[in-house]
Amino acid sequence: MAISKKSQKVFRLIPTGAVRKNGFCAWRFFFSGVENTTGMERRFFVEFIMLNPAVAPDEPVLGFKNRTSIKAEDLQNVLAGTISAQKLQSEEIAVPSYICLKAGQLGAGAKEVCAYTSLSQTVIHSRPFEFSACGCSFSEEVLSGRIAVSPSDLQTHPEYMCDSGIINWDLRFDIRRDFAEGFTGKTLFWSPVGAQTAFSGTFTIDGKVYSVLPKKSFGYIDRFYGKAHDFPYVHLSSSNLTSIISGKTLQNSVFVIQGVYNDRISLVVNLEGSEVVFQAQKGRRSFESHWDFSQMPENGDQEKLHWTVSVHNSKYVVDIDVFCPAQLMFVRSAELPEGQRHTIKKLVGGTGTGEIRLYKKIHRNLELIEHAQISTALCEFGQKEEAEL
């Protein structure tokens, strides 16, 4: 993995201190594969998540699991009239604490499966770095595992918040373009540590085998670490770019957008060596950012979701438009560190298309550096959702 030492340190980062009991960290891997029999291309993901891991280090605690808190003596007191039934709390709400593995596919027929374990059942080696849990593992070059969830598992454990299915993967990856820092705030750190990554190997979902090829994988890896997410949650990224100016595929190009942080977004762009980085925590005079997320009609009866982003400073202007068919978006939910059955609910798609323009400011004029078509963009929009207790 030919990345900077700073990015390597970020890739290996695991929870320490207060974050172990009140926080989370995540490794997210996204890539494309081609089905061996039909040639159909699909977008896949694998995620490793640590949520409040030290709260209950010996067994996973899921916040949505039903836990009756009424004791026999409480019922006797109700019958005796010493306390009222209204004062009884019928369900105990626990703070979530676990290691979670997720894998799935985006687009038509999207689904995800998941597995949960505890910190004590997780093995983390520092040199060489390797993270292993639930029969799944990853290092700085290898990503492998298997997750199986049956329909009966979901009936018994609706708190899993996933689908049934069997997914296994055996992959190698090579990070081609890394950004060690994307956003650093008081409660959250985000890094597109593998903004452009080549994956190779196989990904099998419910018996369908997909080949993951380096030149067609359009891989992406990022890291989240902290105590809380910021909302709304917005993400766009793609390394599948084609120059509208020259018609050539841009082999060494990528862009990533992440936010929203105090009404600002972070943006990293590299178009064939022309690199621009905007970090949301920087002073408001350093750059301005504008974004919008909306629904718009397509062909009269279908809808698309539309992301627009414009960022500029004294030297550069970046304009991005991305569209994703609404029917191909997948709703995903995940628990938040604060517990109380609060979740982040995201619309996620892997078939975004659009355009990106990069301009350089020369006095009062704009010089167009690149104008490119965007394909297979990862598109996400999320909000916080609070359950009624």
Q: Where do the PLM segments sit?
A:
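Structured soluble/peripheral alpha/beta segments that form catalytic or ligand/cofactor-binding pockets
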Residues: 1-389
